[in-house]
From Swiss-Prot:
Keyword tags: Cell membrane, Cell projection, Cilium, Cytoplasm, Cytoplasmic vesicle, Disulfide bond, Flagellum, Ion channel, Ion transport, Membrane, Sodium, Sodium channel, Sodium transport, Transmembrane, Transmembrane helix, Transport
Subcellular location, principal: membrane
Entry's transmembrane regions: 56-76, 532-552
Name under which the protein is recorded: Epithelial sodium channel subunit alpha
GO cellular component: acrosomal vesicle; apical plasma membrane; cytoplasm; motile cilium; sodium channel complex
Similarity comment: Belongs to the amiloride-sensitive sodium channel (TC 1.A.6) family. SCNN1A subfamily.
Length: 655
């Protein structure tokens, strides 16, 4: 039975197990008639109404485009990796943080007076020249009257000195020491700045480090000279001989229990001097708070005497305090809080734990992927990383390290004796560092997890006027120190949790893969009312489109080759003498068209009156019939007795 007969009998053509459609029209008709996507069948059922067909086609394509536009928005939102912040409040006992207090004075003046006497004397001369300053009229002792000023100065005053500058950074050639008929720029209405000149090693490239205030300029200039002096002194000699904690902390207790030597560690800060960290968690078990309130925290009585302060470097009286986590270094100059003399300062704390997402969700790190060597003995901290990065850059480009930062291995601090142009190099780098041109802030990302303490401070006069006498008397006898200035030499500090509720803030992905698929499914159902299997049908349609395209291309190529072969066959019938050569060329082209043509020379058939032959039928003994035609036998496999009528009806064989 032929295919047409099967189609006529069954009403539908039988589909093969693996087969494709012959044209795009058949493919789209089958898809529109059988798909579960809404609206597609309308395009086929309305094919006799062109207006409906066009309308439903436009509607389908428009809806399809809007849906995929929504898909694009959803994918854009997903790949932006948004996060949600979750806040929770918990109540439990709290580990007390580390508390660091510093004296606000790098050295007691009587300890370093020998090293700084010449610098202080020269500073007084500068003040006298620029501002007509006389320390004797202020009731202070002049540093130039000290016998320690004799000898060679430890700094090069001709290299860098304070100068008044106009808007063009031109030095003001103003009064000199002892001049009585000259005037200072500060008496003029014209604006002048004050600063000092910095040059490179050759002296060819120079710039002025200027300030609008003479106080700021003098402190920065003095600090620069102070570094040049102290950096030349071995670190062992820099240790103050009078470094007992009792000279700074008169009393200490936590939860109404006295502190011990195991509860604190000491270190020296280059600007703030002796610093003591309580509850650092290294030498003893960390403190814990079970009850909130000012009476259940850390209480310190501090000495804040100002008589032994460095006059040109320590311009603030009191002490400095910083509350920080145990595994973080104290950066007193960045986050500290000053304590006033004669005042009781109460600092209430509330703990916060922050947890961020890294990777594609945020630019945070745990420090393992940071390429900056941490110069601080602590866990990863952004401030420590930034300072370490800046110090490494200074060492690399200036050949020495900045005195206020820890040193990398094998480096030494900058000073005139080691690098005369280090100031020029440092201030140039600092400007680039502040503008983030060195890349330190980009390299040092914020940590993914850290603990923060929100603080509120309250102040009150301490001791009061009626209790000042007996409190200072007791403190003087207990610490064997004569307090001549009363409450101006002492201060009290309280650090406590004002509540044991602590807040946890965490980030979580707000648009996950599940959310994306859910939203895309909602959009698909909204615009087409379909399911996941409908998406599979769309994928099948795309695959069939590709397959039909390949079939159509191969069919066209075959037809082109067939047309070429037919034209060459006609040429063969008229050029018999060259048949051999043409057959060879045709064979080459037929191979390219995936066809083989066999050409044979045959003799013309004999002329007969009729093509009907009467051939006797011979039956074999086994009841098989044999017909003899042109000396060739054709065997019939069916028994003769079973089909007599059929054999008779067949009649003669026609060739």
């Amino acid at each position: 039975m032929t295919d047409k007969e099967e189609e006529a009998e069954g009403g539908k053509k039988k589909e093969p197990m693996i087969g494709f459609y012959d044209s795009y029209q058949e493919l789209f008709e089958f898809f529109c008639n059988n798909t579960t996507i809404h609206g597609t069948i309308r395009m086929v059922c309305s094919k006799h109404n062109n207006m409906k067909t066009v309308s439903w086609t436009i509607l389908f394509i428009t809806t399809f485009g809007v849906m995929y536009w929504q898909f694009g928005l959803l994918l854009g939102q997903y790949y932006s990796y948004p996060v949600s912040i979750t806040m929770s409040v918990n109540f439990d006992k709290l580990i007390f943080p580390a508390v660091t207090v510093c004296t606000l004075n790098p050295y007691r003046y009587n300890v370093v007076s020998t090293q700084l006497a010449n610098l202080d004397c020269y500073t007084e001369e500068l003040l006298s020249t620029l501002y007509h300053y006389n320390p004797l009229t202020s009731g202070n002792q002049s540093a130039c009257n000290s016998s320690s000023t004799a000898g060679t100065r430890a700094f090069d005053e001709s290299y860098m000195k304070l100068e008044f500058l106009n808007d063009e950074n031109t030095a003001y050639s103003g009064p000199v020491k002892g001049a009585t008929n000259s005037t200072s720029p500060v008496n003029h209405t014209e604006f002048y700045r004050i600063g000092f000149k910095l040059c490179n090693a050759t002296g060819e490239d120079c710039f002025y480090q200027t300030y609008s205030s003479g106080v700021d300029a003098l402190r920065e200039w003095y600090k620069f000279q102070y570094i040049n002096i102290m950096a030349q002194i071995p670190s062992q000699s820099n240790q103050e001989d009078d470094s007992q904690i009792s000279n700074f902390v008169y009393a200490c207790e936590f939860n109404k229990v006295s502190c011990g030597v195991e509860n604190y560690t000491r270190f020296r800060h280059p600007v703030y001097g002796n610093c003591y960290t309580y509850n650092d968690g290294q030498s003893a078990t960390p403190w814990a708070s079970f009850v909130p309130g000012v009476g259940n925290g850390l209480s310190l009585v501090l000495r804040t005497e100002q008589n032994d302060f460095l006059p040109f470097l320590s311009t603030v009286a009191g002490a400095r305090v910083l509350v920080h986590d145990q595994n973080q270094p104290p950066f007193m100059e960045d986050s500290g809080l000053d304590i006033r003399p004669g005042v009781e300062t109460s600092i209430g704390m509330k703990k916060e734990i922050i947890s961020r997402l890294g990777g594609v969700y945020g630019n945070c790190t745990d420090g393992s992927d940071i390429d900056v060597v941490n110069l601080y003995n602590s866990d990863y901290n952004q401030q420590a990383c930034v300072r370490s990065c800046f110090q490494a850059t200074i060492v690399q480009q200036c050949g020495c390290g900045y005195y206020f930062y820890p040193l990398p291995s094998g480096a030494e601090y900058c000073s005139y004796s080691r690098n005369k142009s280090w100031g020029y190099c440092y201030y140039k780098l600092y400007k680039a560092f502040a503008a983030d041109e060195l890349g330190c802030f980009r390299r040092c990302r914020k940590p993914c997890q850290y603990t923060d303490y929100k603080m509120t401070a309250g102040y009150a006069q301490w001791p009061s006027s009626v209790s000042e006498s007996w409190i200072t008397s007791i403190l003087s006898q207990e610490n064997q120190y004569n307090m001549t200035s009363g409450r101006k030499n002492i201060a009290k500090l309280n650090v406590y949790f004002y509540e044991l509720n602590y807040q946890t803030m965490g980030e979580s992905p707000s648009f996950t893969v599940v959310t994306l698929l859910s939203n895309m499914g909602s959009q698909w159902s909204l615009w087409f009312g379909s399911s996941v299997l409908s998406v599979v049908e769309m994928g099948e349609l795309v695959f069939d489109l590709i397959a039909v395209g390949v079939i159509v291309l191969r069919r066209r190529r075959r037809e082109k080759c067939q047309a070429s072969s037919d034209g060459e066959g006609t040429s063969d019938s008229t050029a018999g003498t060259h048949r051999g050569q043409e057959n060879a060329s045709r064979s080459g082209r037929d191979v390219a068209c995936n066809r083989f043509v066999v050409v044979a020379e045959i003799s013309p058939p004999p002329a007969y009156d009729t093509l009907q032959l009467d051939v006797p039928v011979a039956c074999a003994p086994d009841c098989e019939c044999t017909q003899h035609v042109s000396h060739a036998s054709v065997h019939s496999q069916a028994p003769c007795s079973s089909q007599p009528e059929q054999e008779a009806s067949e009649g003669p064989t026609v060739l």
